[in-house]
Amino acid sequence: MIVEFRTYTLQPGSVAQAEERFAAGLANRTKVSPLGAFWHTEVGPLNQIIHVWPYDSLEARTKARSTHVEGWPPAIREFIVDQTSQIFVPAPFSPKFEPAALGGLYEIRTYTYKPGAIAGVIETWSKAIDARTNLSPLAFAGSSELGDLNIWCHIWAYKDAQARFEIREKARRDGIWPPRGGTPGQLLKQVNMLVVPAAFSPLH
């Protein structure tokens, strides 16, 4: 299993229109392979849309993307400022991208580690993840395979911003999270953003 995250930076004021055009062609596209999630940024880099596509393999991705689909890709090129694509491999404890109502606000956190550190991260997290997911749902966790390397991505769902604050505070206060252990000095950089699901997002 691989998961592709496609992030498009759009011109200011164009996100709503881009989402409408994306939705118009989506029914035909998802006959080829399912959409995992679709968000737009609320806090962090603005005017971005993030669409997530799970595939069984790189070969399955190539086949799906080479299949002709009526009305696809959506007619949003006029809005696009920048496009990036990154492919992740889910951690053993990561949920699958399946339709679910997990919350109205999602936090995407990406951590850059020193080369070779990700295996240790997975081991450390696996010991603490159940206690953390009792507080709020984990939507995804995985490491980068193509694109920027040594990236650890984890996505958490919350009812709203206030719930996020309260849950994260409780996790820290009760010693539930962040996970303890691991090798010090491996984490190099942390970035987060808050995103909101589009009306048609399977994960919402």
Task: Describe each model-derived feature in a short phrase.
Residues 12-14, 114-117:
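Short acidic-aromatic low-complexity motifs
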Residues 16-20, 56-68, 119-123, 160-173:
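Short amphipathic alpha-helices within nucleic acid-binding modules
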Residues 33-50, 70-105, 127-130, 135-153, ...:
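Glycine-rich beta-strand-turn "strand-cap" elements at beta-sheet edges
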Residues 20-24, 123-127, 131:
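A non-catalytic, amphipathic alpha-helix used as a structural packing/dimerization or gating element
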Residues 96, 114-115, 162:
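A short, structured loop/turn motif at beta-sheet edges
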Residues 4-5, 105-113:
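N-terminal beta-strand motif that seeds the catalytic metal site of vicinal oxygen chelate
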Residues 1-58:
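The feature marks the first
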Residues 8, 53-56, 111-112, 153, ...:
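Extracellular/lumenal glycan-associated surfaces
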